[in-house]
Amino acid sequence: MFDFDGTLSLIREGWPEVMLPMFEELLPSVNDDDSASVRAMLLDDIMTLNGKQTIFQMMKFAERVTERGGEALDPLEYKHEYLRRLEVRIQSRVESLASGDAKPVEFLLHGSVALLDCLEARGWDLYLASGTDEPFVRREAELLGLGRYFGERVYGAQDDFMSFSKKQVIERILRENNVGGDDLLVIGDGYVEIEDGKNVGGLAVAVASDEARNGAGQFDEWKRKRLLGVGADIVVPDYRDAAVLVDVIVGK
């Protein structure tokens, strides 16, 4: 089971640079505010919930607004405003992929196709599960040419947020394939999928990708430490050594 954004797709690279300023703009101020500490608090909230549905980040932000004596909006309203701002940021990327002006490889984490080809060649069933709304995940997976790997096995966030979680997808995968957790491989850059995979006995490959410098082969140290902290078995910056990674996964 793959996560999507930051694990395969870079179309939404820079999304924290949209969410964080929005939160800073909308958070009520208090007398003893220190802008640096407020920013650090909000960023920690955002990244701690990375991998869960976007609505959970909005629910946490609504709590912060209330804590400061503000009148919080419905978290869904915050989510819709965030998605509106993010769509402005990524619109040119989506349009350039749709028109053919950009090639999918420009917006795929380095080595993604090689890794997917290696796993597919072994006959493994590949699933995609994302905290991004499902229609966007399906749109962007197709733009990146990933549909042939995942088919209909693509899952994303729903407006009824209780009807989707990566834990639920994992449970469904195990049930439908009649396998135990030790047959599950989870690959992602968010702590949620790593933790959920480990909780059922799966193997977890964490992707501490530096999305802004794709192909540099450098770790995002914040991600690396956080993902190791929740039990990742392997941490990679990208998939430049896809064949070697698969050999390690299967115990060669």
Region roles according to the model:
Residues 164-197:
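Conserved Lys-Pro-Asp/Glu-containing loop-to-beta segment of HAD-superfamily phosphomonoesterases
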Residues 44-106, 110-121:
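A metal-dependent, Asp-based hydrolase signature
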Residues 76-77, 147-163:
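A short, structured active-site edge motif that brings together acidic residues
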Residues 155, 233-239:
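Short acidic-hydrophobic, aromatic-tinged amphipathic segments that line or gate anion-handling sites
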